[in-house]
Amino acid sequence: FEIMSTEHSHAAAALAVELAIAGKVGSVMKGSLHSDEILGAVVAGGSGLRTERRISHVYVMDVPAYSKLLVVTDAAINIAPTLDQKRDICQNAVDLMHMLGVATPKVAVLAAVETVNDKMPATLDAAALTVMAARGQIKGALVDGPLAFDIAISLEAARTKGIVSSVAGDADILLVPDLEAGNMLAKQLLYFANADAAALVLGARVPIILTSRSDSLRVRMTSAALAKLVAAKRTAGLGLAIR
C-alpha cells in the first residue's frame, strides 16, 4: 500500500475523499483524526461522495445469544433524527442487508412500549415508519413498530405480551429512536453480551469505516472486511443504487 503525506488532519480527510471520488479507493476509513473531520469532508457541499440519502451509522453485530446477524442503527451520527431522517436511516440498513444476502430484512422500530402514545414521540415515529413501509416509502423490508427491545428479539416475550408481529422475535435490524439509545444498546451488546461487531457509515457513494476509539483491533478488522464486501457489491452492481 502507499502512504501519502499531508500537512494536517483536514488535508488528510480531503485527500481521502478525493481518492474515493477518483475511484482509487473503494472505501474511506477514519484513522486518528476526529469523526467530524472525515464526515465533514464527505458531506461538504460539492463533495462527490454526497448523495440525496442521509448518511447514517450501522453496527452489524454477531451476538452469541441471537440466531443471526443483528444491525443496530443509528448509534453514532444522527443525534435526534426526524421522521424523514429515520426513513433514510432505515433504508440504508435495509440496503446493506440486501448486500449481505437477506432478501427481505425485518426491521423493528424500537420504543419503550408497543402501543402508540402521543406523549412518547418515538412511538409516533415508529407507527409512521410502519405505514411508510407498507406504502412503499421504505422498500425491500418488513417494518413494524413501535416494538420494545424484548419483543424485537424474543418470540417468547412477544407471546407473553400477546403481540402478533412478523418481526417480533426475529428482527434483523433494530432502528433506535435516537443516538443515545443506540449507542448504549450497541455497547451493552459489545461488553455484556460479548458480541462481535463491524461499524460502517452508509448513505455516501462509498462505505466509510467509522469505529470508536475504544473499539478493539478485531472490530476494526471486521469493519474493514465489511466495507470491502459492500464496495465490491456496489462495483458489481449488486447493491441498490444511491443517487
Predicted regions and their residues:
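Anion-binding alpha/beta catalytic cores of soluble intermediary-metabolism enzymes, centered on
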Residues: F1-V167, D172-R243
